[in-house]
Amino acid sequence: MAKKSVTKKKNVKKNIARGIVCISASFNNTNVTITDEMGNVLCWATAGGLGFKGSKKSTPYAAQQAVESAMEKAKEHGIKEVGIKVQGPGSGRETAVKSVGAVEGIKVLWLKDITPLPHNGCRPPKRRRV
């Protein structure tokens, strides 16, 4: 029986000047996704993917490292200007936004908070008793 040949997908480096940094900061992890203006994903990074495990994923330092990793990948695509979308209540929100602004050679154009707020929707989970 003949073996199937596995073809590896090539990472195509695009030359894009503007992008959008989407930061999703949950209570457990921080996701950073960098897209072009149409919404096509160029690169991404997560705190858990960088080696932070357990409760360390939700720290501001882990969020900062995730942003720095994603922005290094984005520079390979030629991104010079970004807009920032922030979603979620996590502890890494402010640190992630500050570290996007601190990256050399990348200018921040705008900042939006797109956290969904319920108009009295589902009942929230009960308070923790520790």
Curated annotation (Swiss-Prot):
Coiled-coil segments on the chain, per record: none
Keywords tagged on the record: Ribonucleoprotein, Ribosomal protein, RNA-binding, rRNA-binding
Domain of life: Bacteria
Matching Pfam families: Ribosomal_S11
GO CC terms: ribonucleoprotein complex; ribosome
A GO MF label: rRNA binding
GO terms of biological process kind: translation
Subunit record text: Part of the 30S ribosomal subunit. Interacts with proteins S7 and S18. Binds to IF-3.
Function according to Swiss-Prot or TrEMBL: Located on the platform of the 30S subunit, it bridges several disparate RNA helices of the 16S rRNA. Forms part of the Shine-Dalgarno cleft in the 70S ribosome.
Family: Belongs to the universal ribosomal protein uS11 family.
Entry protein name: Small ribosomal subunit protein uS11
Name of encoding gene: rpsK
